[in-house]
Amino acid sequence: MPLRPHIGLGFPAHAYQKRHVEPHDRSTGYQPKVRITDRYRIIGFISSGTYGRVYKAVGRNGKPVGEFAIKKFKPDKEGEQISYTGISQSAIREMSLCSELHHINVIRLCEIVLEDKCIFMVFEYAEHDLLQIIHHHTQQPRHPIPPATIKSIMFQLLNGCQYLHINWVLHRDLKPANIMVTSSGEVKIGDLGLARRFDKPLHSLFSGDKVVVTIWYRAPELILGSYHYTPAIDMWAVGCIFAELLSLRPIFKGEEAKMDSKKTVPFRRNQMQKIIEIMGVPTKDKWPLLSTMPEYNQLNTLANSMASSHHNHHSHHHPHHHHGHYGSRNPPPPGGSNLEKWYYSTINHTSAPGGTPPLASLGSEGYKLLAGLLEYDPSKRLTAAQALQSPFFSTGDRVSANCFEGCKNEYPCRRVSQDDNDIRTSSLPGTKRSGLPDDSLIRPAKRQKE
């Protein structure tokens, strides 16, 4: 039976927002002769990945109105021979889900064009993403993201997650690079290539697409081999993103373990170690189902080796405390956590001696929200709906729908290359462009006037 996009997913009516439908939005049925370049003028090339390439475009003669990001899926390629074997699972999932999802905090799919066996997905354009914004703040002089901006980003991100989860959709790959921000400060969850429905039984993360996703944002239950997905995996990632907005670096920066020849997934020992260094060793008291995890024995081995190396270190050195800005290299005592220490050393950090720490106003409510999102036991971890009710958002400054409101920072625009802006004839991507954040940035002053 041929694969068919999962259209008409029967989402609850309350989940839809009323939205203004432009005349060009109204479906006129399948139009095989509409060419992508008849509808859009390509401004330039943005980036490429395993799926294909992304271009920036505007509507021809101002219709459709606005700027767009066009994602071109490449056909399957065997050697130099292009074989039209169909569409990847990832592309079908992204198309079917995006066609159904309509929310201010989820990137909007405007249309899908099929031309010469290539698929073009046309999305609304976002000038920034969180990776780019975080990177901008790490440039000298290093300066924290303003508290009001962090609050607004977190509220909008949680709002988008709540909408996905109400509609039985797991994103599964939330990370700063996939969280888009428009020039008007609207936060939009993007890249639903790994997203999937969870209202029916699922296979393990690795039994479908063998995709390597960044493991820094991966929930502990997945590292410990859980076969069951819940929206809690997305909430752990949101907690990691919150921590990164505060400290401007990934909180759990582990190393990717290599798959073996049998395509089995090794235990991500190093990633688990990074989590334990800040969160402590998980215990059955706090996480009753812990002992049912497939990698439970591996966890015990890791915890024992960390404890013995910590003991050896202290038997040869005078006891001393690490009050480093980014948490301790030593594991906390059994059942204990360094997260509170990590949080307060981060928000109370100031570059100017005697100055007021810029993030101090986030206070204890920020810690409670972070700790609730980074809860080991997925059944106790905050849901998006619970997190939105956090006093973190109702105390202090009003949360703005524009995360740049009152912001003095001018963020660089997304870099658009003119070298390869022929969307129809461009070669298929041979190599992925460098993933460094500054690869897609240019200073505002150098921005080309359109």
Swiss-Prot record:
Principal subcellular localization: nucleus
Disordered: annotated segments: 307-341, 418-450
Required co-factors: Mg(2+)
EC number, UniProt record: 2.7.11.22, 2.7.11.23
Organism superkingdom: Eukaryota
Record's subcellular location: Nucleus
Limits of the Protein kinase domain: 40-393
Tagged with keyword ATP-binding: yes
Residues of the active site: 173 (proton acceptor)
Keywords, in A-Z order: Activator, ATP-binding, Kinase, Magnesium, Metal-binding, Nucleotide-binding, Nucleus, Repressor, Serine/threonine-protein kinase, Transcription, Transcription regulation, Transferase
UniProt record similarity statement: Belongs to the protein kinase superfamily. CMGC Ser/Thr protein kinase family. CDC2/CDKX subfamily.
Subunit structure comment from the entry: Component of the SRB8-11 complex, a regulatory module of the Mediator complex. Interacts with SSN8/FCC1.
Task of the protein: Component of the SRB8-11 complex. The SRB8-11 complex is a regulatory module of the Mediator complex which is itself involved in regulation of basal and activated RNA polymerase II-dependent transcription. The SRB8-11 complex may be involved in the transcriptional repression of a subset of genes regulated by Mediator. It may inhibit the association of the Mediator complex with RNA polymerase II to form the holoenzyme complex. The SRB8-11 complex phosphorylates the C-terminal domain (CTD) of the largest subunit of RNA polymerase II. Required for normal growth and secondary metabolism.
Name of the protein described by the UniProt record: Serine/threonine-protein kinase SSN3
Organism of derivation: Gibberella moniliformis (Maize ear and stalk rot fungus)
